[in-house]
From Swiss-Prot:
Main location: endoplasmic reticulum
Protein task: May be part of a complex that binds ubiquitinated proteins and that is necessary for the export of misfolded proteins from the ER to the cytoplasm, where they are degraded by the proteasome.
GO biological process: proteasome-mediated ubiquitin-dependent protein catabolic process; ubiquitin-dependent protein catabolic process
UniProt name for this protein: NPL4-like protein
Pfam families according to UniProt: NPL4
Homology family: Belongs to the NPL4 family.
Annotated compartments: Endoplasmic reticulum
Lineage of the species this protein comes from: Eukaryota, Viridiplantae, Streptophyta, Embryophyta, Tracheophyta
Gene3D superfamilies: Cytidine Deaminase, domain 2, Phosphatidylinositol 3-kinase Catalytic Subunit, Chain A, domain 1
Domain MPN: 130-279
Pathway: Protein degradation; proteasomal ubiquitin-dependent pathway
Entries under CDD domains matching the protein: MPN_NPL4, Ubl_AtNPL4_like
CC annotations in GO: endoplasmic reticulum; nucleus
Length: 415
C-alpha cells in the first residue's frame, strides 16, 4: 500500500510492505527513513488541519501500536505529518574552502557568502488569519465548473470582499469571473481593463475590494513523475504574480478541486493558501523562472539562480515550500447570487434582467438589485465616477433607490 505523507515541506510517498500487519509505529519508522524526521519529533494525523498554524484541534495518531488497518487507509490515502522546522536530519554539505580569485579578486569571508545566499524557508504562519466564503458565491462558482465544465478545464475568478483590520480575517462576498480561456493545465485570463474598472468601482461603493484569486484544477491535469503536488509550477507563478499585484498582505488564493474516492464518487473541495513572502520576493526580484516548458516537472518551480532550500543548493524548489495554508470557513454575505454570471460563453441578455426583476417583485427594489453580477451589467450604462457610487451606496445601506436609477434599470430590462 502506498500512502501519501503531506507535510509543510511537500508530499512524499511511503510504501507500506504489509499493510494488514503494519502499525502506526511501523509507519513512523518508514517516515524516519524516507523523510529523515526522527520518530520522537513526528506528529501524525488524518486531519489536514494539522498543517495549519493553530493545529490543536487535529486528532493525532498517538498510539504506535495501533494497526493501520483500523484507520481505514487505502492505497493513495493522505497522512499529515508535522514536525519542528529544523527536525529533518539531513544537513547541507560543508562549504568548500574559499580563496582569493586571482590578483583581482577580493577574498570572501563565510559571512559574505551567507549574506549573498538566497535562502528559501517555510513560512510557518499566514498573514491572513482565515478566509470565509459567501456560501452562494462559492456554490455558484463550483457548480458551473462541475455541471458545465465537468472539471475538464480550469476556471478562475477574482475574490472580492472585506479584510477585518483587527483579526486579519478575509471575508469573500462575491466572485468576479473575467474573460478567460482554460485548458487542463492553464487558465489564461483575458483581462478587460474597462470591465475591471467597473468591478472595482462597484466593490468600492459596497465597501469591498479585491482580496484574492480562486481557480479550479482539472481532473486530467499533468502528473509528476516525482510525486504528488498541491499546485503546479504554472499555478504557483500565476498565483504569485497576482498576489504581488494585489497589494494587500492578507491576499488569499483558493483552489477548488474534485477528489474521486475509491467507490468512484466525487467530492468538491475548497482549500485556501497564501503564497509565502519569500515566494513573492523571488518573483519581484526576477529569481523565479517565468518561462515554463511543457517537459518541466509541474511539481517544481525553477529558479534563475541557485537558492538554498531544504538545506541544499538547488535551481528547483518543491512548490509546496511556497504554500502557507489558510483556515477556511463560510458565511452568508450581504449580496444575492441569482443573476446570470458574466463571461461564461454567451453574453448576458437584457431579458435576464427583466426575468430577475419580475421574479422578485414582492421585494423592495434595492433588494432586487443587490446582486453583484446584476450591478456589473447595469454599470456598463452608468457613469463610473458618479452613478455607480450613488447606486452602490443604496445597495450597501439598503436604502431607497432614487427614482431616476429605478426607471433606468427598468427601461434596460424592457429593452
Amino acid at each position: 500500500m502506498i500512502l501519501r505523507i503531506r507535510s509543510r515541506d511537500g508530499t512524499d510517498r511511503i510504501t507500506v510492505p504489509d499493510p494488514a500487519a503494519a502499525t502506526v509505529g511501523d509507519l513512523q519508522r518508514l517516515i524516519a527513513a524516507r523523510v529523515t524526521v526522527p520518530v520522537p519529533l513526528q506528529r501524525l494525523s488524518l486531519d489536514p488541519a494539522l498543517l495549519l498554524p493553530s493545529s490543536a484541534s487535529a486528532a493525532l495518531l498517538a498510539d504506535p501500536a495501533a494497526p493501520l488497518s483500523s484507520l481505514r487507509l487505502s492505497n493513495g490515502s493522505f497522512v499529515y505529518l508535522s514536525y519542528p522546522p529544523d527536525a529533518r536530519s539531513s544537513q547541507p554539505p560543508p562549504p568548500k574552502a574559499l580563496s582569493a580569485a586571482g590578483s583581482f579578486g577580493k577574498k570572501m569571508t563565510m559571512d559574505d557568502l551567507i549574506a549573498r545566499q538566497i535562502r528559501v524557508t517555510r513560512q510557518e504562519a499566514p498573514l491572513c488569519a482565515a478566509a470565509s466564503f459567501d456560501r452562494d458565491s462559492a456554490n455558484a462558482f463550483q457548480l458551473h465548473v462541475a455541471e458545465s465544465l465537468a472539471f475538464a478545464t480550469k476556471r478562475a475568478g477574482f475574490l472580492y470582499g472585506r479584510v477585518d483590520a483587527d483579526t486579519k480575517e478575509v471575508f469573500v462576498d462575491f466572485i468576479y469571473e473575467p474573460p478567460q480561456v482554460g485548458t487542463e493545465d492553464v487558465v489564461q485570463l483575458m483581462r478587460d481593463a474597462q470591465e475591471e474598472a467597473r468591478v472595482d468601482a462597484i466593490a468600492h461603493g459596497l465597501g469591498m475590494r479585491r482580496v484574492g484569486l480562486v481557480f479550479t484544477q482539472a481532473v486530467g491535469r499533468k502528473t509528476s513523475d516525482t510525486g504528488e503536488y498541491t499546485m503546479s509550477n504554472r499555478e504557483v507563478l500565476q498565483a504569485t504574480e497576482l498576489q504581488a499585484e494585489g497589494g494587500i498582505p492578507e491576499w488569499v488564493t483558493a483552489i477548488v478541486k474534485l477528489e474521486v474516492g475509491d467507490d468512484g464518487s466525487g467530492d468538491v473541495h475548497f482549500e485556501a493558501f497564501q503564497m509565502s513572502e519569500i515566494c513573492v520576493k523571488l518573483f519581484k526580484d526576477g529569481v523565479l523562472e517565468t518561462e515554463i516548458g511543457d517537459k518541466d516537472d509541474p511539481r517544481l518551480s525553477k529558479m534563475r539562480k541557485e537558492v538554498v532550500a531544504g538545506g541544499k543548493d538547488t535551481m528547483e524548489v518543491d512548490n509546496d515550500f511556497f504554500l502557507v495554508p489558510v483556515k477556511i470557513s463560510d458565511h452568508q454575505g450581504p449580496l444575492s447570487t441569482g443573476f446570470p454570471i458574466e463571461n461564461r460563453g454567451n453574453p448576458v441578455a437584457m431579458s435576464a434582467l427583466k426575468s430577475h426583476l419580475d421574479r422578485a417583485k414582492h421585494l423592495p427594489f434595492v433588494k432586487r438589485i443587490s446582486d453583484f453580477h446584476l450591478l456589473l451589467l447595469v454599470a456598463a450604462f452608468l457613469d463610473i465616477k458618479a452613478d455607480v457610487p450613488a447606486l452602490t451606496a443604496c445597495v450597501k445601506n439598503q436604502s431607497v433607490v432614487p427614482e431616476g436609477y429605478q426607471l433606468l434599470i427598468e427601461s434596460l430590462a424592457g429593452a
